[in-house]
Amino acid sequence: MSEYNAQDYKFGQPRWCPGCGDHFFLGALHKAMGELGIAPHNIAVISGIGCSSRLPYYMNTYGFHTIHGRSAAIATGAKVANPDLTVWQVSGDGDGLAIGGNHFIHAVRRNIDLNMILLNNRIYGLTKGQYSPTSVRGFVSKSSPYGTVEDPFRPAELCFGARGNFFARCVATDLASAVECLKAAAKHKGASVTEVLQNCVIFNNGTHESVYTKEGRAKNAIYLEHGKPMIFGENREYGLMQEGFGLKVVKIGENGITENDILVHDAHCKDTTLQLKLALMEGPDFPIALGVIRDVEAVTYDEAVHAQVQEVKAAKSYHNFSELLETNEIWEIK
């Protein structure tokens, strides 16, 4: 059992709007850290700019509230400089996928050992309600008064397209699932991306309404667990089967279909084909996938950097800057 609990990671009084999804997520993060049992002084929480990026102020850990869109780059430096540090990088959909989109995909591609959290409310909240890279087509906002005329990013596609090895999704109001996703992300060696679906009660309330309540998730979501059949529904009466190159929803008990016919989730499969199809499912025809969708191990960037440094040092006659200066002839200028 961990010697720490959620209280050990709490600090300050959050200043988010009442009902903001950030409150729910913060509670899940505190609880996950308590169960992981990592000492607060061995954790750094690094954020960019936005409502969600105030999160480091409410953590009794090291933290850095950085600049717009650059938290992944700064988190990279922290992790490479101190590989023993557990680094959480937190951003919203605007901060993380617009100005920070390039840093996001390259941190994932490099497989830096970062726990990357994307709080997705499909809106710019701090700047008072402009559409973001994840806002749906036709969304009316202060910066799109007649509706957007572009399709949104889907975070899972970005992660998979950048050759990501870990992707999970949870809902801010679902404490148990969020805690399990965060713990799995922390235990994963390499870049882990966890998308957190949450509402902005002021500027985009109800954007994830179909899965924001327990009753809604029972009807409209599927919880994926590695090695378990993909079954869902209020009475676990539906399942997923393969149809051609796609998926289909079937009702267990009809047309001779049993639980044995249902696809089994394999989060550890290196091939992303089925995992991506699961991550991109959406209503009303399919349930929204929650839980750990992909979890594959690979060599991390920070490990490779330090291994290379040691290899080069071993082959050189000098091992630090001082020795380098003294390697060749030295003269004194008077």
Tell me the role of every PLM-derived stretch:
Residues 49-51, 121-123, 174, 197-202, ...:
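Glycine-rich beta-alpha junction loops
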Residues 168-223:
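ATP/pyrophosphate-binding catalytic subdomain of soluble kinases
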Residues 49-125:
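Thiamine diphosphate
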Residues 12, 39-43, 81-87, 109-115, ...:
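Short coil/turn connectors at secondary-structure junctions
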Residues 3-4, 84, 132-185:
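Conserved thiamine diphosphate
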Residues 2, 11-12, 202-334:
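Flexible, low-complexity linker and terminal segments
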Residues 6-67:
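Active-site diphosphate/adenylate-binding microenvironment
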